């Protein structure tokens, strides 16, 4: 029996809801009208962090600091423990998580916390060919204050595979949505680009979709085999500043970018 892919939606005071993938046909047409991402300035602050299933005790303190004036939090390896769910619903209007796989108690996967409801939501999963576990991605679209629609892609890429066929397939499944979207895009997360082959596949993919890479002056991103694992790509936006924050609250350091 094929397992259905879905997102789990958390909203304060409401029952937990399963959200199934919306049709890509809606991207080529008119999406529902939404409420703009709340921002007191013209800048959009985005945080990207592999939170390591909250295995280190200081995760909540660091995450609380990161939420200050951030409209979007893109987490990877977010395990929906009561503590994380309480944090998400207390600090953000809505949180969507894609369970990559079910742990004994709480599912783990990518999770996007936002200050407004998405007008489009499509969870994706790809199975690790060697470990037979899944990695997840989440595509959401939000209204901006200038009435443009922002596509946000939260990615945790396949890690263990021979060659890059499955890795590229995961990216290409995301690309189907990006190609149909008219407007700005942010694609970010843990891309596990630890080999030359993987990095080249990622670069080809982002060039094809006209996505630019965010660079960091003081680059403290987590490294594996001499290459960074975490990236932020974008189009039709400008960067005000971009930083990496060193921390021992996870095995990855969070990335923070202000767009305008």
UniProtKB/Swiss-Prot annotation:
Cellular component GO terms held in the UniProt record: cytoplasm
Stored Pfam families: Exo_endo_phos
GO molecular function: catalytic activity
Keywords: Cytoplasm
Places the protein is found: Cytoplasm
Superkingdom, natural source: Bacteria
Primary location recorded for the protein, binned into one broad class: cytoplasm
Claim: Cytoplasm is one of the keywords in the record: yes
Family statement: Belongs to the UPF0294 family.
Name under which the protein is recorded: UPF0294 protein plu0699
């Amino acid at each position: 029996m094929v397992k259905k892919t879905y997102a789990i939606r958390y909203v304060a005071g409401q029952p937990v809801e399963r959200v199934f993938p919306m049709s890509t046909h809606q991207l080529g047409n008119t999406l529902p009208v939404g409420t703009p991402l709340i921002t007191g300035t013209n800048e959009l602050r985005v945080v990207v962090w592999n939170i390591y299933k909250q295995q280190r005790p200081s995760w909540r303190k660091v995450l609380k600091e990161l939420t200050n004036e951030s409209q979007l939090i893109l987490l990877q390896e977010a395990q929906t423990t009561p503590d994380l769910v309480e944090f998400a619903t207390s600090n953000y209007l809505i949180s969507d998580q894609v369970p990559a796989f079910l742990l004994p108690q709480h599912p783990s996967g990518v999770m996007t916390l936002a200050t407004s409801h998405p007008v489009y939501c499509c969870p994706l999963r790809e199975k690790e060919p060697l470990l037979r576990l899944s990695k997840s991605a989440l595509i959401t679209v939000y209204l901006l204050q200038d009435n443009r629609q922002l596509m946000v892609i939260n990615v945790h890429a396949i890690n263990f595979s021979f060659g890059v066929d499955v890795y590229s397939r995961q990216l290409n499944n995301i690309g189907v949505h990006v190609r149909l979207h008219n407007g700005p895009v942010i694609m970010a997360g843990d891309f596990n680009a630890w080999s030359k082959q993987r990095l080249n596949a990622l670069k080809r993919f982002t060039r094809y979709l006209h996505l630019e890479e965010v660079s960091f002056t003081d680059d403290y991103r987590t490294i594996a085999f001499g290459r960074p694992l975490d990236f932020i790509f974008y189009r039709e936006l400008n960067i005000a500043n971009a930083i990496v924050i060193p921390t021992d609250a996870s095995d990855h350091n969070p990335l923070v970018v202000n767009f305008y």
